[in-house]
Swiss-Prot record:
Active site: 145, 169, 237, 240, 263, 272 (o-(3'-phospho-dna)-tyrosine intermediate)
Entries under InterPro entries matching the protein: CB, DNA_brk_join_enz, Integrase-like_cat_sf, Integrase_catalytic, Integrase_recombinase_N, Integrase_SAM-like_N, Recomb_XerC, Tyrosine_recombinase_XerC/XerD
Name of the protein described by the UniProt record: Tyrosine recombinase XerC
GO cellular component, one term: cytoplasm
SUPFAM superfamilies: DNA breaking-rejoining enzymes
Limits of the Tyr recombinase domain: 106-285
Annotated keywords: Cell cycle, Cell division, Chromosome partition, Cytoplasm, DNA integration, DNA recombination, DNA-binding
Oligomer and partners: Forms a cyclic heterotetrameric complex composed of two molecules of XerC and two molecules of XerD.
Pfam families found in the cross-reference section: Phage_int_SAM_1, Phage_integrase
Chain ranges of the Core-binding (CB) domain: 2-85
Function (record text): Site-specific tyrosine recombinase, which acts by catalyzing the cutting and rejoining of the recombining DNA molecules. The XerC-XerD complex is essential to convert dimers of the bacterial chromosome into monomers to permit their segregation at cell division. It also contributes to the segregational stability of plasmids.
Matches recorded under NCBIfam families: recomb_XerC
Length: 296
């Protein structure tokens, strides 16, 4: 398969257009395949065996790649092999049964409600402070991903219906309720935004009027965590985790939390049940007469 590079181009277009994967996922897949191509000596997929690819995975593992990274490598190889098989370029997919080491489950870290309230108690000193408060209120109110919030346009927010339209992973749309506190914060920000020379329809813009980048949003949140005196770092996903945990603690409705978070698989949401159990265990230890140690 002499024109393997051109098939990689076609594959990335297929991922972006037909599979509608995010640009970041497409870039990650491309990187994994280009790295594999280099390590395998740019051999044709028609010549590769499962043993070749297993050897590649073992080599990457010895180089210290994490289980998460190896899982991405295996996924990219499987998907590319399946694509070539479908296009009739190979007779069998050598990556079909490829596996990576199991990832250890790490519980997402979240803020307790008091810490969230402290973080969001931002004095309305200027327009940027109002904007940042609105951003963090919306993160916590809706459990949005960073990419979802950054992509929001003004038209996506229906203040009358108290809803926001979000485009999530795989270009899937979901309509989410927005809490009254977040709506009020966004309303204060929009008064400032309407007086700015905005260059596009983005809901959240910089002082120059351009859409806020992912990195800018992260940096502002880190700054506010320091200003507000929080002892831990704060990033968008931490507020998303906090939203999920607090919702589950209050409602116990795993399916509803799954829908709100935009998880395609309930198993992804179930990690929060471990956090919820930790909360219940603390309550039990503090309240049940038989749970307390003698002398407490």
């Amino acid at each position: 398969m002499a024109d393997q590079a051109s098939w990689l181009e076609r594959f990335t277009r297929y991922l972006a257009t037909e599979r509608q994967l995010s640009p970041m996922t497409v870039r990650n897949y491309r990187f994994e395949l280009e790295r594999a191509d280099t390590l395998l000596g740019q051999r044709s997929w028609q010549q590769l065996s499962r043993q070749d690819l297993s050897g590649l995975m073992a080599r990457l593992h010895r180089q210290g790649l994490s289980p998460r990274s190896l899982s991405l490598t295996a996924s990219a190889l499987k998907q590319f092999g399946q694509f070539l098989l479908k296009e009739g370029l190979i007779d069998t997919n050598p990556a079909a049964t490829l596996s990576a080491p199991k990832q250890s489950k790490t519980l997402p870290k979240n803020l307790d409600p008091d810490s969230v309230n402290h973080l969001l108690d931002i004095p309305p000193e200027d327009g940027l402070a109002l904007r940042d408060k609105a951003i963090m209120e919306l993160f916590y109110s809706c459990g949005l991903r960073l990419a979802e919030l950054a992509a929001l346009d003004v038209k996506d927010l229906d203040r009358e219906s108290r809803e926001v339209r979000v485009i999530g992973k795989g270009s899937k749309e979901r309509i989410l309720p927005v809490g009254s506190v977040a709506l009020a914060a966004i309303g204060d920000w929009l008064k400032v935004r309407n007086q700015m020379p905005c260059q596009d329809d983005a809901l959240f813009v910089s002082s120059r009027g351009s859409r806020l980048s992912h990195r800018s949003i992260q940096a502002r949140m880190e700054k506010w965590a320091q200003i507000q005196g929080l002892s831990v770092g704060v990033h968008p996903h931490k507020l998303r985790h906090s939203f999920a945990t607090h919702m589950l603690e209050s409602s116990g409705d795993l399916r509803a939390v799954q829908e709100l978070l935009g998880h395609a698989n309930l198993a992804t949401t179930q990690i929060y049940t471990s956090l919820d159990f930790q909360h219940l265990a603390k309550v039990y230890d503090g309240a049940h007469p038989r749970a307390r140690k003698k002398g407490d």
